[in-house]
Structure formats: structure tokens, C-alpha cells
Amino acid sequence: MLRHHIQLSFHRLFAFCVSRRYFMFKRGLNMTETRESTTAKLCSFARAYHSNTGRQKIFDDYLAYDLMGKEEYEEIGQLIENDFESEQLSINYSFSSKRIIEKLNRYIAPIPLSRIAFAENKLLEFAQKHGKCQYVVCGAGMDTFAFRNGNPDIHVFELDHPNTGRYKRERVKQLEWNIPDNLTFVPIDFSTDNMTQALLDAGFQPDVPSFFAILGVSYYLTLPVFAQTIGEISGLCTADSQIVFDYPDETTLSGSGAERVHTLAEITEKLGEKMMHGYSFREISETLERYSYEIEDHETPQMIERQYFENRTDGITAFENIHFILADRRESA
């Protein structure tokens, strides 16, 4: 019964990942494609813009612009310029960098740039230690790691809705990119599919060291659902495995929270994606302990500031409420 309950919660998480990041619309020969949601496109835009224009690069996602495409890039630039009011977008207008840079650097760029830098650095350390390993990207969307990856020993599994995978593969085809041999798209229909079985059917090997990334998701989940998600991953992974994620702390929606934290919450709610309250470090620590994980690295906002934003001249600073976690799965007693 508990296993079934955890599985359902994991389904809710990934169904959420899909619904948060994507929506259906009519276009093209098949009349249905899947596009990223606005907040996910904001993150893609931040990586693309930073890689194209940033002088002090926090993270160089040099393929983000190509995969996103000029049309969507311009659309999101306009959205930021127009204070996140989508009704004012125009296909005949290009956004002004001068008009978006302050809002982009203050509200949008800090979290996605620093968390992907943290996650991929930890992944590379994991791969260096273990050699052959598996990287599971939960709700991969327009993630580009598999196409930037130069290590053939890292096998990438991208979990997403079937329509999402088709849309991404179509973009890759349009760009004439080759799909690497060590990339596997894992389609998940959560009304019918079991995540564990889908991964196993796709070639996931439980006895191979595995690294799971769940980025940008905890903001929108209650602690019980997120906790049960950790439990499901723990049941799938071997002892030589790690999980990485980011989370907002308990100050997120409190009266004492920073101004821009509240502003970002207002922006995401305006875009139809309401943030939940944050978690305390104690809650996170106890949750991981319950499912045989031990925290290897906890990056506080102050540590993130020193690691990624110190001495910058562009005004990008770490968010006051965001933490990064890397956890090891240990052998059960």
C-alpha cells in the first residue's frame, strides 16, 4: 500500500513537471505539438541570453538559443519588457535589451543559471568518480546537456511527456543535430505508465551508478508529495547514486521575506504557476534521512552568492531564499 501511495505521488510530481512546463496548441501537419510553459521558457531565455551576451559567464549553455529558436526567444524578451503581460506581444517587434536587462538579472536569471551550474558540476564529479553512470533528467524539457556532453560514459535519460519528446526531437531534426547514442528519451504517460517500469524498459540499469536531477520543481509542491518523490527515487537507485535539487526555504512567502522573492512569486502566479510555501532545512534533512539519503552538499544563499555571484558587475546576485542540495544514497542498515 505504501509503495502504491509513493508511486502515485511520483506520478503526480512528473505529471506536474509536464503540465508546468508544457501546454498543447494547434499548429503544423499533425495539429498538435507541445511547447514549454512560460516560466520554463523564461529559464531557457535566461540561459540563452546569458550565454550570448554575458561577459562573466556563470554557466555557458551555448546551445540554448538554437534549441529555443528565434521566435520564442523574441517572444520571451518581449514578455519581460512588457512586465510579463502576454497580451502586448507582437510578432513584428523585437525586444530592447536595455529595457529588459535589469528585470532579467534581478528576477529571472539568478536561479536557473546558478542551479544548472551547480547540478552539472556535481554530475561531472560523480562521473569522474564512477566512470560509467546514468544521468536521469526529470522533466527535461529543452535541457541541452545531452548535446553538450562530451563524456560517452554518461548515459542520459530524459523523462518527459510523449508529446514533449516529439516536439524536442522535431526541433533537433530542424537544427540537423545528431541524437547521441548515449541519450534516451523516456516518454511517460502518467494516466497509464509506471515511471520505474518505463525507465527499466528504456534500458535503465539499477546496478549502474545513477545521478538524478529534479530542478525547479520543489517550488510548486507540498512537502509530503516531494518527500514521497524522494522515496520513489530511492527505491529505484543503487547505493552508488546521488540526487540534486533546489528548494525555497521557509522565508519564501513570509512577511519577513525579501522584496524580490515576493515579486518573483507574483510574477509566476501572474503566469499561472503559483509557488507553494518553502521548506525548512530540518524538513529537507529529515525527509532525506527517512529514505536513506545523506546530505553531501548544502549550498545556502550566502554560499551560492560567494560561489557564483561574488564580484560581478552586472548586478546578478543569489536569491535570498534558494538553497541547493546534493545527497548520497547510503546502504540501509
Language model features by range: what are they?
Residues 195-206:
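Short amphipathic alpha-helix with an adjacent loop that forms part of the alpha/beta core around
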Residues 24-136, 142-186:
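Rossmann-like AdoMet
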Residues 221-232:
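A short, conserved alpha-helix within the catalytic core of class I
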Residues 213:
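A conserved beta-strand element that flanks and buttresses the S-adenosyl-L-methionine
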